Amino acid sequence: MKLQLCAVGRLRSGPERDLVEDYLARFERTGRPLGLPPVQLLEFEDRKGGGMEAEADLIAKAVAPGAALVVLDERGRTLSSPEFADHLAHWRDSGRDVALAIGGADGLAPRLRDRADLAMSFGRMVWPHMLVRVMLAEQLYRAATILAGSPYHRV
């Protein structure tokens, strides 16, 4: 299993980057004994000004053939943390690669959303795409703690 976080834009040094790195390091430590691989963070920039379509091309080229494509989108399905953990466990148990895609400021191209195995939302509000990275990294860590039976996730 390979786990990719594909994101448009480069996260500069600062609190958001620190949080993403911290949560992904926690995920790696917690997930390794569970058979979850470290997250490969891929950042893309459309330097030619092609917008969402060019960004979609860059993301699509990076996604491994046969990988489950999960897109973060305001129109996506709102999952609970345990439901997200169940998805992650299912992909792990089936040996399927997973690519989690976060679009730029304008979102993701419709053709990439249509191709997704799962469109996921962090609620009906729109979030800055750089903050979504932090939220997704935290949810990955939370999912690993749920699968490990750790007390981090409380209901």
From Swiss-Prot:
<keyword id="KW-0698">rRNA processing</keyword>
<keyword id="KW-0808">Transferase</keyword>
<feature type="binding site">
    <location>
        <begin position="122"/>
        <end position="127"/>
    </location>
    <ligand>
        <name>S-adenosyl-L-methionine</name>
    </ligand>
</feature>
<dbReference type="InterPro" id="IPR003742">
    <property type="entry name" value="RlmH-like"/>
</dbReference>
<keyword id="KW-0963">Cytoplasm</keyword>
<dbReference type="GO" id="GO:0005737">
    <property type="term" value="C:cytoplasm"/>
</dbReference>
<keyword id="KW-0489">Methyltransferase</keyword>
<comment type="similarity">
    <text>Belongs to the RNA methyltransferase RlmH family.</text>
</comment>
<comment type="function">
    <text>Specifically methylates the pseudouridine at position 1915 (m3Psi1915) in 23S rRNA.</text>
</comment>
<feature type="binding site">
    <location>
        <position position="103"/>
    </location>
    <ligand>
        <name>S-adenosyl-L-methionine</name>
    </ligand>
</feature>
<dbReference type="GO" id="GO:0070038">
    <property type="term" value="F:rRNA (pseudouridine-N3-)-methyltransferase activity"/>
</dbReference>
<feature type="binding site">
    <location>
        <position position="72"/>
    </location>
    <ligand>
        <name>S-adenosyl-L-methionine</name>
    </ligand>
</feature>
<dbReference type="Pfam" id="PF02590">
    <property type="entry name" value="SPOUT_MTase"/>
</dbReference>
<dbReference type="InterPro" id="IPR029028">
    <property type="entry name" value="Alpha/beta_knot_MTases"/>
</dbReference>
<protein>
    <recommendedName>
        <fullName>Ribosomal RNA large subunit methyltransferase H</fullName>
        <ecNumber>2.1.1.177</ecNumber>
    </recommendedName>
</protein>
<dbReference type="InterPro" id="IPR029026">
    <property type="entry name" value="tRNA_m1G_MTases_N"/>
</dbReference>
<comment type="subunit">
    <text>Homodimer.</text>
</comment>
<keyword id="KW-0949">S-adenosyl-L-methionine</keyword>
